[in-house]
Swiss-Prot record:
Substrate binds at L75, C76, H77, M111, E112. It comes from the Bacteria. Keywords: Lyase, Molybdenum cofactor biosynthesis. It comes from Corynebacterium glutamicum (strain R). Belongs to the MoaC family. Its EC number is 4.6.1.17. It catalyses: (8S)-3',8-cyclo-7,8-dihydroguanosine 5'-triphosphate = cyclic pyranopterin phosphate + diphosphate. The active site is at D126. It is an enzyme of class 4 (lyase). GO terms for molecular function: cyclic pyranopterin monophosphate synthase activity. The lineage of its organism: Bacteria, Bacillati, Actinomycetota, Actinomycetes, Mycobacteriales. This is Cyclic pyranopterin monophosphate synthase.
Length: 156
């Protein structure tokens, strides 16, 4: 098993030293789902929810979440994010949220992509909970990443 890079010999946590790493172009794509009743899906995608048009709000929340990742996830490095996209795909039983993040830096952007998806999903949940109390956030994961010493990776 490989050693955790953010844990010192005595077991205490520290922020990994990335000052000696080369800058490379890095990307990450993550996804997540909000499951809900079919009638609520229709309201969500037609801007018909009591709280208003949820998808533009959730998109901005996801982008803001990615930018705030080092403020809410301990030990994450602040990164100059060059591009963040958050997209929504209608499903019969909910919405699939996909976030893509890009930077040129010394560490990856997987956490930023995951935070974008999570924040967007939480925002969708907040805006539908009045009409579907049984909604579920599920399946948040990294789909792919590029760049860095460990190279490219994808679930496919």
């Amino acid at each position: 098993m490989s050693k955790l890079t953010h844990v010192r010999e005595d077991g205490s946590a520290h922020m990994v030293d990335v000052t000696g790493k080369n800058e490379t172009s890095r990307t990450a794509v993550a996804e997540g789902f909000v499951k809900m009743r079919g009638d609520v899906v229709k309201q969500l995608f037609s801007a018909g929810l009591p709280k208003g048009d949820a998808l533009p709000v959730a998109r901005i929340a996801g982008i803001m979440g990615a930018k705030k990742t080092p403020d809410i996830i301990p030990l994450c490095h602040p990164l100059p994010l060059g591009k963040i996209t958050v997209d929504f795909f209608e499903l019969a039983d909910g919405v699939r949220i996909e976030a893509s993040v890009k930077t040129r830096g010394v560490t990856g952007v997987e956490m930023e992509a995951l935070t974008a998806v999570s924040t967007a999903a939480l925002t969708v949940y907040d805006m539908i909970k009045a009409v579907d109390k049984m909604a579920v956030i599920d399946g948040i994961r990294v789909l792919s990443k590029t760049g860095g010493k460990s190279g490219d990776w994808s679930v496919q």
